[in-house]
Structures are given as structure tokens and as C-alpha cells.
Amino acid sequence: MLSLVQKIIGSRNERFIKKVSRIVQKINSLEPEFEKLSDEQLKAKTFEYRERLANGEILDNLLPEAFATVREAGKRTKNMRHYDVQLIGGIVLHQGKVAEMKTGEGKTLVATLPAYLNALTGDGVHVITVNDYLAKRDAELMSDIYEFLGMSVGVIVADLNPQQRKEAYACDITYGTNNEFGFDYLRDNMAYEKEQQVQRSRNYVIIDEVDSILIDEARTPLIISGASDDSSEMYNLFNRLVPYLEKQEKEEVENEQEQRDFYVDEKSKNAYLTEKGYAKIENMLKKEGILEEDDNLYSPHNITKMHYLNACLRAHSLYQLNIDYIVRDQEIVIIDESTGRAMPGRRWSDGLHQAIEAKEGVKINAENQTMASITFQNFFKLYNKIAGMTGTADTEAFELHSIYGLEVIIIPTNKPMIRKDHHDEIYGSVREKFDAIVEDIKERISKGQPVLVGTASIEASEVLSTLLKKKKIRHNVLNAKQHEKEASIIAMAGYPDNVTIATNMAGRGTDIILGGNLEVEIAQLEDPTPEDIAQIKAEWLKRNEAVKKAGGLCIIGSERHDSRRIDNQLRGRAARQGDPGESKFYLSMDDNLLRIFASQSMAERVKKGLKGGESLAFGFMSKVISKAQGKVESYHFDIRKNLLEYDNVVNTQRKVIYEQRQSLLEAEDVSDILADIRIDVAEQLFHDYVSAGSMHELWDLEGLEKALKSDFMIELDLQKLYEEDDSLGEEDLKRLVREAIEIEFVEKTKNLDSGAVRQFEKFSLLQSLDTHWREHLSSIDHLRNSINLRGYAQKDPKNEYKKEAFELFSTMLDNFKYEVISSLAKIRIATEEETQRAQQEWQESMSDIKAEHESVIDNNQRHDEDEQEEAPKVQQVRREGPKVKRNDPCPCGSGKKYKQCHGKVE
């Protein structure tokens, strides 16, 4: 019934395309008029549009003229004319949607249309790409168009200094990577002077490869951190012990004889010790002198040992060299599971990276303390408008809409797509599969057809390369080890009978042109004459025609990825802009996807039915594979959704802190802010000793006097005052405390230079807020690591997390206020020069901070209900009894006051 309705009225996507086609017609009708304009007249359009905006006109009304202006500028500066489908893509992006445009349809050129239009407001436009190379390339390619129209263009890459970054952000249009934009946001919220901040408003963002950034990288928070204690000895110890543990093939075993020391869950990338394993590792630790004879790993004081053990167990059983990571320059470099790219600078969390460093015998870097963090999900929500482009978003349309509110629109291709997609072939073993791939390659190159083979890992690419060498088939390999050669390898991938092996092609960002890349060939010539260029073009045309006759580029997939989208990205490298092309996937029942997610009974039936070298290739298996991929996609979506729900709790708190911090940073005088804080602190302190509405016999005036003296250097004999005038009530005493604190501050500062005082107060507030926020992030992280244990007490971990995170936050704010007033009361107010020196020393102490795009491929499972969690490393705010006041005995039993024990903020 639904298909019948769609045939009559068209799908939502078709109706949308039809609607915006009317705007395209209007843009096209303006083309003859704009062609007649002189360069100066065309350039003047930018000023005209800005004037009209200032007079109240809206961007939507300017769109047809602005797009016609950009199209004409493209023709004059780049000899490139925006096709109608590119205009549709530009409209989709301007409207804050995701444009799905196939490979080779010119997404880079499309971005110029909405970027120019939205930059007219003067609030800036950010264009996000997946790496520095593409950011530089796209900015350079399109800068002629922008600059012709009077728009400035900036690029944000990793090696820029703060001043260069500030200048780039001040441009009308700024290109850069998602990591750099996110880190600059975090660094700006750690600055101590307004002038140190580099970003301005987050107005409008266009994200290239939007599915890669908003989905694949949604689980990887950006983290700025500083080094904590060195624990390399413990990692080395457990790295030495773990190989003695034996792996159990499945979680449940039928008898004790089958029980081993640990088992793994490959879906969640976790490893678990059995009771036998616990006993074995405890005995080893006792022999090493790490555990006492009567001690055990379950003791609370051994929590950190469990942390090291779990990390090393996972490092040895689940993470493999050349598949999950490589060793480069004596460092562990993670390989992106989606793209096959090396990701220098990114580190796994929860000690996993240190465990792998110990495993591979490289230097173990200290674990880091988080100072600031944000996920891409919450960072991009800071923008007023988000838009995105990609070749493959339709399969993720539900997630993009449910999490980001982004609608996916499929843009028609400029020329019909004629790629031939063959049925998958399934073999019984990996070796048989690779042999079949080699035979297929031989057959295709014999007729001059270029072949691109996509592999899921470096190991697979090297195995295939070895087999091809044995057959004397020349080929290029592109993986995380050869990333420097990427551009030159891709430029040659379309040559006749050329064979290229590449780990997943997602995000490569370079088109494979049949016959080779003509522009690259011309660029490689030294001082070419017109005759040289003509000869190169003639040779290229011959090769281009030969490859087309041979069937175009052939894509061979060596296995299916977990995500259909990644498979589609690989396929999309063939048949660009109406060229011919083919694609085919080769699978084996030992491939990870089928081994982990397909049913065991079905796998056994298929293996039994296949004799050596035989394969299956029919529709039934495609359904099985699609179902397996659907399971994985659903699993990962749940993880990302869960991550967002947890991160939203911290995000709300982050917004509060960053808004308060920005107000402090921009304030010339913080004395009013401090006055309000002093009132709050006086109330807080008073009620710690005098409960509201209580009888005077229950008042602890002696304790209040001691607190005033020790924490604020104030001598106030409240008991004597009350004895002299017993009519003094609770409010009167509270007023006396408040006035005493206020008078102390006035007396301390009255003879000092007001400028120096204001500067010192501002610095103290910022420094204290940063310190407390950093410690709060650490507490939140420990809370989150352990919260799933509440499920055993029949409590909802998510609700418990929200409740306790709120209490932690409230306590942190109270402690921040108390500590900053107490500190200012105790110290001598510095001169302006001393304050500047203190600021400089503080900033120098922050110079070793690291900006890391932390990989949480290992970290998602903390929300898995079945996960074996660690207990928290810090005392949690789980208050089921009365609130512990600052001067009460600490509940830990130490005999100290709470404020001097577990309530102390260092």
C-alpha cells in the first residue's frame, strides 16, 4: 500500500527535490543577467547583500541571487560551473539538513554556495573536514571564489599558534578539522584572559563526511588532560603475568574440566576472569609479594590492581598489532576501525593504552587526569545551525534525525549511475576467499581493468599483498603504514590494469579517475609547454577510453564491514559521474561479522555444504549478512545513544561552569560577584553550626568561632555576645557572621591599589573554579565507571547517575565558593606585578596539558548491563541519611572533621 502511495505522490525526498527545483529554476533564470556584469559589479554584490540584510531582509530571500553570484564567480575564477544538482545540494545545506551526494559529484564546490550566503551575516561560517590535508586542500581550491567576492578564508590546522588561530577564526569562512575546532573550544574555556581566546561565535557549520564525524566519532570524546601518577611498574608486572592465563572458549562451560582462567566478549570488547582465573592470579601476585597471604583481589584497597589486571587482560586477548593498532616511532598508534587510518595523538582510556604499551615493549606514558572534555554530539549542538554532506547517510538517517534533528536528503546524480553490483561470494575459509580474490584480480587486469581491493585491516592487506607477489602481480598497498603516499597511490589507482589494496576507503577524500589523475600528472611536469600538456591530455584520453571499455574501476571487498554505510562508501569509489564500474564482495564464514553475529547453526550448515574452493552466491546469504550488519548497527546506535544520555548530564553542568567562567573572564571588576559569594558562604558556614529553626541549646557557637578563626582569620566571640544579650536570635547571629566576613575583606583591601586587588580577585576565582571543575570531572568519571553496580541493588543506574552527579555538582559549587573566600581571607593580596607573575606561573604549570581525541572503542562498554565494573575510586555522594556537615566527624571513622578529611578540597 505504501509503495502504491509513493508511486502516486512520490516519496518525501522526491517531493522535497521537486519543491527546491523551483528555486533552482529561479537561480538559472538569473544566470544571463549575472554573466553580463563586470567583475567589479559582481564583486559589489556582496556589499549590496550585506546592506539588505542590515535593513531586515532574510537570508532565504537572498538565496537565489547569492547562489547565482557564487556560480558566476566559480565560472570566472575556476572555470567551474555549479550543476543544477549542486545548487539543490547547496539549498539543502543552507536549510540545515544533510545532503547525501555520491562520490565525484563535487561536494567541495557545493559547500561554497551556503558558506557564502551564511557568511554575509558577518558571524562566520565553519567548514569541517576529516583531516588537515583536506582542510588545506579545500580552502586553497575554493579561496579564489570567496576572495573574488570579498570574503576572507582561514584554515585551522594542528600546527598553528594561538594568534594564527585567532586570525583564521576572524575570517568570514574558516576550514578545519572537527578535532581542532573542538579543542579550541575547550582551550578557550581554560583561558585566563579574554585576549587568549581564539574562537568567536558558533553560527553555522557545514560538516563534510558528516556521517563519519557525527556517528563514527560520536563515541570518542575530545579530552584535554594533564599527567597523573606514574604506574608503569604495575602495568609491566601484569603484562608479564597475564600470558600465563588460559582462555576459555565461551562464557558457560558444562563441567569443571573445561573451565579456564578467562573468557572474552568480542561484541563488547571485554574480557572477564573466571573464579579459577581469580585464584590463579591471586597466587601469582602473592608469589610476587604484591598481595599478602591472607589478602584477596576483592578487597577495596586492591581496586587499582584490578584496574591494571583488566586493562592488561584486554590488551592481550582483544587488541591485535596491525589490526587495532600499529607501532610507529616507539609509540602505539590506534587504527580507526571505520577508515583504516592511523590516528596519531589519540589514546584509549581506562588504562588500555598503557597496557598495550607494556605489551609491545614501548615507553609507558602516564595515565592522564581530565581537565576538560566534550563529545562531538554536544560540541556541534552549540552551533545555531548544522548542515552536512556525505556520500552515504541514508542508512543512518534515523540516528542523525533522532540525535541531531538533521534530515537526510538524497541528491540526484548529475549523470545516471551505471555501476554493476555483483552478488557476494561466500567461502568456507579465509584462505579460500583470498585465493578467489587473487584469481578474480588476474582475470580483470588481463583485460586492462583497474582494481581497488578494500580490506578491513592492515594484516589482511599484507596477506593479500603477499599472495599477489607470489603470482607476480604488481600492485600498490595503501594502509595506515603508508599514509604518506596516499595521494600519489590514489592518483594512479584508475590506470589500466592497476591494482590497489587499501584498508577501508572511508574518508579518503580523493576521487579515483579512470585513466589516472590528469591534473596530478600535469602538476608533476617542470615548466610544461602547451605541447607537453596537449600530449599528456591525449595520452590520458586514450587510457580513459581503454578503462571504460574494460568495464571501469572494479571494487573488490575482502569482507563486509560491521556497517552497511562503510561498505557503500567503498562501492561508491567506482562509477563516478556516469562512468562504468563494478563491485563485488568476497566473504568467508570465519570473517568477524559472520563469526560473531551470524547464528552458529547457520554457519555450521554453510561450512558443511561447501567443499574446498566452492562458494555460495545467492540472495539468501545477502539477507543473512544484512541482518548481521543490522544487529551491529543497532548495537552501536544503542551505545552512542546511551553515551549521549550520560554525557548530557555533564553537558548541562559544563554549560553552567563555562557560562560562569566566561562572565568572570569578561568582567572588569568581580567585587560584586565576590560579595554575593561571601553572603552565600556566610549562610553556609552559619547553618553548618546553627541549624535553621533549632533551639539555642543546640547551637554550636564554639565550633562556629573556631571555623571563623581557622578558615577566615576572623576573631568573633559569639558566645560572649549571646551571653551579654540573650535576645539575639538566629538571624541576628547570622548577620554578625556575614558582617564580620565582609569587614575583614574591606579592611584587608582598603589601603591597596584597587586595580591590583581586582586583578588578583579575578585570577583567584578563575584558578579556583578550574581546580574544582577538574576534580569534579575526575569524580564524575569514577562515578560513571561504577554506577552500573547499582543494577544489582534493583536501582536504575541512569537515574542514580543523574541524581548523584547533581549532588556532586552542588557540593562542588559549595566547596568552590567556600574555598575561594577562605583562600582570599588567608593570603596577602598581591601587587599587580605579583599577580601577573602568579598567572604566568600557573599557565606555565598548564603547559604540559595534552589535547587528545580519546578512543572509547574500549570505553563504550561501561554502560553494558553485563559488564563487570570497578568500584569507585573516590567517595560518592550517596546520601540516604542526613547531610554530613563540614564540621561533623567524618563518616569514614578517622576521627577527623569531615572538612579536614573526605570533605577537604585540595
From Swiss-Prot:
Its EC number is 7.4.2.8. Residues 853-906 are annotated as: Disordered. Part of the Sec protein translocase complex. Interacts with the SecYEG preprotein conducting channel. Has a central role in coupling the hydrolysis of ATP to the transfer of proteins into and across the cell membrane, serving both as a receptor for the preprotein-SecB complex and as an ATP-driven molecular motor driving the stepwise translocation of polypeptide chains across the membrane. Keywords: ATP-binding, Cell inner membrane, Cell membrane, Cytoplasm, Membrane, Metal-binding, Nucleotide-binding, Protein transport, Translocase, Translocation, Transport, Zinc. Residues 853-865, 877-888 have a biased composition (Basic and acidic residues). It holds the Pfam family SecA_SW. GO terms for molecular function: ATP binding; metal ion binding; protein-exporting ATPase activity. It comes from Francisella tularensis subsp. holarctica (strain OSU18). Its main location: membrane. It is found in: Cell inner membrane; Cytoplasm. It comes from the Bacteria. It is a peripheral membrane protein. Residues 896-906 have a biased composition (Basic residues). May bind 1 zinc ion per subunit. ATP binds at residues 86, 104-108, 511. One of its GO terms (biological process) is intracellular protein transmembrane transport. This is Protein translocase subunit SecA. Its cofactor is Zn(2+). Zn(2+) binds at residues 890, 892, 901-902. Belongs to the SecA family. It catalyses: ATP + H2O + cellular proteinSide 1 = ADP + phosphate + cellular proteinSide 2. The keyword Zinc applies.
